[in-house]
Regions:
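N-terminal basic/disordered segments at the start of proteins
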Residues: 24-40, 47-51
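N-terminal beta-loop-helix "entrance" segment that forms/cooperates
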Residues: 48-69, 181-186
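Short, polar loop motifs at secondary-structure junctions
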Residues: 49-56, 116-121, 155-157, 173-179
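Glycine-rich, highly charged phosphate/nucleotide-binding loops
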Residues: 63-79, 190-199
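Glycine/small-residue-rich loop that forms an oxyanion/phosphate-binding "nest" at active or ligand-binding sites
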Residues: 86-133
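Anionic-ligand binding region
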Residues: 152-188
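A C-terminal functional module that forms or caps the active site or interfaces directly
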Residues: 182, 186-206, 211, 216-232, ...
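C-terminal functional extensions of proteins
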Residues: 216-218, 225-228, 236, 240-268
Length: 268
């Protein structure tokens, strides 16, 4: 009996601590890769939250949930109820509301927060970017210029271009817009990246595109349209990213894993 008690005491002293509970705010390729890496690491349990921006999101490793939390207050309640140790914000660079809610909820609950955000694209020689601060400014630019426009900003902001009467739009999005498209002249193209240079160049030429509207999402999956625009000397209305909330941030999955290793080194 005493030997068993001693063995149990030793096991209790050396057993692994409880896994770190991670709430991963997903929606990007980096978030999917990070979920897979964390799910394979016994030090962590991960649940990915998908806001529902796309109807058929790609599968993620580990647990997942869909839909919002009900703003900052709802997310704060969830963090407390689920005993979340850290929130990792792996959302799109333009998901400003989600990121702001996460920052405020983490502040309220004293929950650790890390942002994983790929670097933006940088303008290079040959690029003809028309930098704008937001979607309304992009729409105003298109309204002034007119022409045949390749609109690649996702389905949620299309309505901002409804006043562009002198433009024809090739609208590309993963899913059909939930509401009626209010622009007068358009063609809808449903497609999910990654896209390659040859196909993007052919798409622009075939449709006689003379202006592209894009968010500065960064990353390789949709960069081919920027390369194609450069090759064809086409102007790109480039929408700058919103300013993110203050806090710890890293540019890649590997950097996130290194940050987590350092942050929780003493725990394990």
């Amino acid at each position: 009996m005493s030997w068993c008690l001693t063995a149990m005491a030793i096991w209790s002293a050396v057993r692994m601590p409880n896994p770190i509970k991670v709430l991963l705010l997903g929606g990007t390729s980096e978030a999917r890769m990070l979920a897979a890496r964390l799910n394979a690491d016994e030090r962590f349990t991960v649940e990915t939250s998908l806001a529902g921006a796309t109807e058929k999101p790609l599968p993620v490793a580990g647990g997942s949930r869909r839909g919002g939390f009900g703003g900052t207050a709802g997310l704060a309640d969830y963090l407390r109820a689920a005993s979340v140790d850290i929130v990792i914000d792996g959302t799109h660079a333009f998901a400003a509301t989600i990121s702001r809610n996460a920052a405020e909820a983490c502040d309220q609950t004293k929950t650790e927060r890390l942002v994983v955000q790929r670097p933006p694209w940088e303008k290079t020689e040959g690029d003809r970017w028309l930098d704008v601060s937001d979607v309304p400014e992009a729409a105003a630019t298109v309204s002034q210029r007119g022409g045949r426009v390749f609109l690649t900003i996702g389905r949620q902001d299309i309505a901002a271009f409804s006043g562009c009467r002198d433009a024809w739009f090739l609208i590309r999005s993963i899913d059909r817009p939930k509401q009626m498209i209010e622009v007068e002249n358009y063609q809808l193209l449903q497609a999910r990246g990654p896209f390659d240079f040859a196909a993007e160049k052919a798409l622009l030429e075939t449709n006689g595109i003379d202006l592209i509207v894009s968010k500065n999402s960064g990353g390789p999956d949709t960069y081919a349209k920027i390369e194609a625009a450069r090759a064809l000397a086409l102007p790109v209305v480039m929408i700058r990213r919103p300013t993110p909330p203050d806090g710890s941030a890293v540019p890649s999955v590997d950097a996130a894993l290194a940050w987590l290793d350092e942050r929780y080194a003493e725990v394990f």
